[in-house]
Amino acid sequence: MVSRRVQALLDQLRVQGIQDEQVLNALAAVPREKFVDEAFEQKAWDNIALPIGQGQTISQPYMVARMTELLELTPQSRVLEIGTGSGYQTAILAHLVQHVCSVERIKGLQWQARRRLKNLDLHNVSTRHGDGWQGWQARAPFDAIIVTAAPPEIPTALMTQLDEGGILVLPVGEEHQYLKRVRRRGGEFIIDTVEAVRFVPLVKGELA
């Protein structure tokens, strides 16, 4: 039985078009208040993005649900997340698949996320301190790649690390950003534009 605040959010997400019950169940199962600073705990189940420090944010629940739904996951999906951040999106993915790989360029955020995931007994996640633009070649190929910050263009490395039939979901752009879904079909990449979005930029190269 979920709390009224959680149920209200789930109802709102359904109204906004989220249909995958597995995704909604994962959102209900992950305590979002554990991934935000104490000052924002009262807003944890509001359908808004919140700051997590280091110039980064925890995404709006609608956007987490939308991007996760677009990945078309199965329990066997090999998943790469670019931008571990607070670890919230990571936790949602960990409830849906057998194993998640996640890359974060800010060491402090990576450590905090690992601690949160461990405290929630989510041990099916591998995290790495690295440049998200480069993906995680040693663990490739992936059935699904999700990027939680916006590059100005789609990183080539991420496209090449998609397996046949794999899906990449990411925001793209600088001043004007759009959520894109890229599907690999043989040697081709089919790119669909989903909706206008606003994310922090995906910083290239420099680790922190």
Curated annotation (Swiss-Prot):
Identify the GO cellular component terms for this protein: cytoplasm
Which residue positions are annotated as catalytic?
59
What's the Enzyme Commission number for this chain? 2.1.1.77
Domain of life here?
Answer: Bacteria
Gene Ontology MF term list: protein-L-isoaspartate (D-aspartate) O-methyltransferase activity
Q: Which UniProt keywords apply?
A: Cytoplasm, Methyltransferase, S-adenosyl-L-methionine, Transferase
This enzyme catalyses: [protein]-L-isoaspartate + S-adenosyl-L-methionine = [protein]-L-isoaspartate alpha-methyl ester + S-adenosyl-L-homocysteine
Q: What is its main location?
A: cytoplasm
Instruction: Quote the subcellular location field of this record.
Output: Cytoplasm
Q: Which PANTHER family match?
A: PROTEIN-L-ISOASPARTATE O-METHYLTRANSFERASE, PROTEIN-L-ISOASPARTATE(D-ASPARTATE) O-METHYLTRANSFERASE
Q: Cross-referenced NCBIfam families, in alphabetical order?
A: pimt, PRK00312.1
Family statement: Belongs to the methyltransferase superfamily. L-isoaspartyl/D-aspartyl protein methyltransferase family.
The protein's job, in short, is: Catalyzes the methyl esterification of L-isoaspartyl residues in peptides and proteins that result from spontaneous decomposition of normal L-aspartyl and L-asparaginyl residues. It plays a role in the repair and/or degradation of damaged proteins.
| Name of the molecule in the record | Protein-L-isoaspartate O-methyltransferase
